Design a protein with these regions (language model features):
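Karyopherin-beta/Importin-beta family HEAT-repeat alpha-solenoid scaffold
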Residues: 1-594
């Protein structure tokens, strides 16, 4: 950035005065349908969001209102509207305090809700960018970034009219919008469930198929974030969802019916996790036979949804799943080694996840015949160039260690080798010259040198203004501090945490590998990615706690509170304690999450 606002006030004023003319240029290119120049103009404003906040500050409110109107105008090209909505999403994410201070959240929310009605018969599952899908994304960010008074409360007030509308597009839009806002304001929405759930239940029985599909999506999203609260309504929700599933099962040649199948599986997958085992057990005989029929369906999404749901049913129902265990494992085993295509690898990951949940449900003895082939497949998965599948393998090892505890020792060589190789992966050479267009990549995944990298902004700080919302000490929200969070770093976060599960459950069997593991974890304490640091420190403390318990089992006196310490631990335990404490204190001052 060549212009320094603090040092060049005249130049800053000149630039600010040019903004209205720049907006006029954008408007004229949109009105004329000049795609190339319009896209350059949108890109210019996106770029300015990443520059000094002072550049847009004078006209920021007017610019936001212009983009709202542009995104809401149905007479212009959808691509231009989607660009305007994308700009608004970036504004909310990176100028959230400015947006909050303008008190424009309610208008953004209601405009976005109206745009969602344009979804029509298009599936919300599709990935093509449209104004309606962009509006759903805007609602998601609004709910996550702004207070309920500006987003969720006005949304809920408006939903009554949408839910009761004679137009199915409005009913569909209402429940989809509700689902998108749950994650951002779960606590507030939990207080309104007594009014929300009757409406959602009614929409599950709607005369229009797409509305019922949207209602299933809404239930899944509600249950994801409010599992316990939604789970209490299982007696009414599950029968309604099964009714949809059964109706759709009678017409599998229709894509909309397949969407209902997938939606039912996803909704029950999310909902049943919030049930107590005795409640989940009531539904096993109804759910498992229905879903298992889709293990061999040609639609990959249906197959994956059904397999994932059965895993969750097993996890929730525990021993009640045993009567179906042999048949289900026979149906799933054929997918454990598939690897002919990316779709095969995706499905293989879902299957391994579900098998891990099933193992936890039925216990060590019934699952024993399947452990060796599953462990062999999980070790092979590390070399299939599929990051998600590698993470699945690590999580599976964690589950198997919890189920088999010391008996997992026979698989420790392979598991430790895989985890160690993960932590030793090189993260150098992944630096990217993001430049001033980096904002276009924030939140996206890019592939560089065969590695998937998720680009994340390191700060959500907002710009200074006269509002009392900015009294907290904050830096200007410049984009100079954008970092890439690589898939490798995310893998390391999971691997470090899995180490903790394996160590704490295999206990003495892990001692031959302990020194090398602790050494590697200590190296990760100052990793650039917060998730890796937290996992490494957490596992180090779990390791110390496990060794302390083993020392007590060997005759050491139990710990007693007070100073000076009344228990003298073995020298090796003291040494580990000192290392862990020093590692913790070395990052203590700089960590936000202590």
């Amino acid at each position: 950035m060549l212009l320094e606002p603090d040092e060049e006030p005249k130049e800053l004023a000149m630039f600010q005065d040019a903004i209205p003319a720049m907006v006029s240029v954008l408007k004229s290119t949109v009105d004329e349908g000049d795609e190339n120049n319009a896209m350059q103009a949108f890109e210019c404003f996106q770029t300015l969001l990443g520059c000094e906040s002072a550049l847009l500050q004078k006209h920021f409110g007017d610019l936001v209102k212009f983009m709202i109107e542009l995104g809401s105008t149905t007479s212009i090209d959808d691509e231009f509207r989607s660009q305007a909505l994308a700009f608004l999403m970036q504004c909310v994410r990176y100028r959230k305090l400015k947006i909050q201070g303008l008190r424009i959240g309610e208008e953004l929310t209601l405009k976005a809700l109206q745009i969602v009605t344009e979804l029509g018969d298009l599936s919300s599952e599709e990935e093509d960018v449209t104004p309606a899908r962009s509006a759903l994304g805007l609602l998601d960010i609004l709910a996550s970034s702004l207070p309920p008074s500006q987003v969720v409360i006005p949304l809920l007030k408006a939903l009554g009219g949408y839910f009761s509308s004679q137009d199915p597009d409005y009913r569909q839009a209402g429940v989809l919008a509700l689902g998108m806002c749950v994650e951002g304001a779960p606590d507030f929405i939990a207080t309104q469930l007594h009014e929300i759930l009757p409406a959602v239940l009614s929409l599950l029985e709607d005369s229009d198929l797409k509305v019922r599909g949207a209602a299933l999506n809404g239930v899944a999203r509600l249950a994801d974030d409010l599992a316990e609260d939604i789970g209490k309504e299982h007696a009414t929700l599950i029968p309604a969802m099964l009714k949809n599933f059964d109706l759709a099962s009678n017409n599998l040649n229709d894509e909309r019916s397949l969407q209902i199948i997938r939606g039912s599986c996803h909704a029950i997958d999310s909902l049943i996790e919030g049930l107590e085992p005795e409640d989940a057990a009531k539904y096993v005989s109804e759910l498992v036979p229905r879903f298992s029929k889709f293990f061999h369906h040609e639609d990959l999404k249906c197959k994956s949804a059904a397999i994932g749901a059965v895993g969750s049913i097993a996890s929730a129902s525990e021993k009640a799943f045993l009567p179906f265990f042999p048949e289900i494992m026979q149906g799933l085993s054929q997918y454990v080694r598939i690897k002919d295509s990316p779709d095969d690898l995706d499905l293989r990951g879902v299957v391994c996840d579900s098998m891990g949940k099933i193992a936890s449900a039925v216990g060590a003895e019934p699952f024993e015949p399947y452990v060796l082939p599953l462990m062999e497949a999980s070790e092979e998965a590390l070399h299939l160039d599929h990051p998600r599948l590698r993470e699945t393998s690590y999580i599976l090892w964690s589950t198997m260690a919890k189920v088999y505890e010391e008996q997992f020792s026979k698989y420790l060589p392979g598991a430790v080798k895989g985890l160690q190789e993960c932590l030793e992966q090189d993260e150098t050479g992944l630096d990217v010259e993001l430049g001033e267009h980096a904002k276009d990549l924030v939140g996206a995944e890019v592939v560089i040198d065969g590695r998937k990298i998720k680009v994340a902004a390191a700060t959500d700080d907002d710009d200074d203004d006269d509002s009392d919302l900015n009294e907290a000490a904050m830096d200007d929200d410049e984009w100079d501090d954008i970092n890439g969070v690589s898939a490798v770093a995310m893998e390391k976060e999971i691997a470090a945490e899995v180490y903790g599960d394996i160590i704490s459950h295999t206990r003495r069997q892990y001692l031959p590998y302990l020194e090398a593991t602790v050494t590697k974890l200590l190296e990760l304490v100052d990793h650039t990615y917060e998730g890796v640091r937290k996992s490494a420190i957490g596992t180090l403390w779990r390791t110390y706690a496990s060794l302390w318990e083993m020392a007590e089992a060997d005759g050491m006196a139990k710990w007693k509170p007070g100073l000076p310490p009344q228990v003298d631990p073995p020298q090796e335990l003291k040494k580990l304690g000192n290392l862990v404490m020093m590692a913790t204190m070395s990052v203590w001052q700089d960590e936000m999450d202590r």
